[in-house]
């Protein structure tokens, strides 16, 4: 099948490429590197018919990053390096219909999302990540499913790590694609034990600065 665009699969097929990218960030002074696992849950991987490899991809992604972070921490213990397990938004949305003629339709349920996320996060935790980073959040309901999955995965794996969130806004008014302001988003996740909240993607650092 066609694997173009499936960058996560490189953790299994060409790990040296991912190692080289991590090394360049560490050489540049990065304190935290992200695993190459942004799309590595079965919802997104189903597009490539490799959804059954999700656990392996995440495990490899975490171990590759962990090994390099540890190498650089050993070189300079005064500057410890950390690994964040990258968890993307998937290619589906819980809050909006993909069908303009049927606004009630949803391509995925909360439970389906949570299940896919939990599988991914358990493998990332097993591989040794220091934190879970739920990023490029465009739908608060997707994010809630991911947060729920993270707490479940940590409990199951017996490992509690910081939970980091990063939102993407889709207009200069600072709203997410699902229509929430940043304040509204914060209110919707304030129940969770979140370590940090940031912004990514969107339309660049300069335009994001006011938020």
Task: Give residue spans per PLM region.
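Domain-level signal for soluble alpha/beta catalytic cores
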Residues: 1-211
């Amino acid at each position: 099948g066609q694997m173009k665009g499936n960058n996560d699969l490189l953790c299994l097929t060409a790990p040296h490429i991912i190692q080289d990218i991590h090394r360049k960030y560490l050489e540049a002074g990065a304190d935290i590197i992200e695993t190459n696992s942004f799309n590595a849950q079965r919802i997104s991987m189903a597009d490539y018919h490799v959804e059954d490899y999700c656990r392996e991809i995440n495990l490899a992604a975490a171990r590759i990053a962990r090994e390099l972070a540890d190498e650089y921490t050993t070189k300079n213990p005064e500057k410890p390096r950390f690994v964040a397990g990258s968890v993307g938004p998937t290619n589906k949305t819980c809050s909006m219909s993909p069908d303009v003629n049927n606004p009630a339709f949803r391509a995925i349920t909360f439970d389906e999302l949570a299940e896919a996320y939990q599988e991914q996060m358990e493998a990332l935790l097993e591989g040794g990540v220091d934190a879970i980073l739920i990023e490029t959040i465009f739908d608060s309901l997707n994010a809630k499913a991911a947060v729920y999955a993270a707490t479940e995965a940590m409990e199951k794996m017996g490992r509690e790590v910081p939970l980091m969130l990063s939102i993407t806004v889709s207009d200069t008014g600072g709203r997410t694609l699902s229509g929430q302001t940043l304040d509204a988003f914060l209110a919707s996740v304030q129940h969770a034990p979140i370590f940090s909240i940031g912004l990514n993607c969107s339309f660049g650092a300069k335009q994001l600065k006011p938020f």
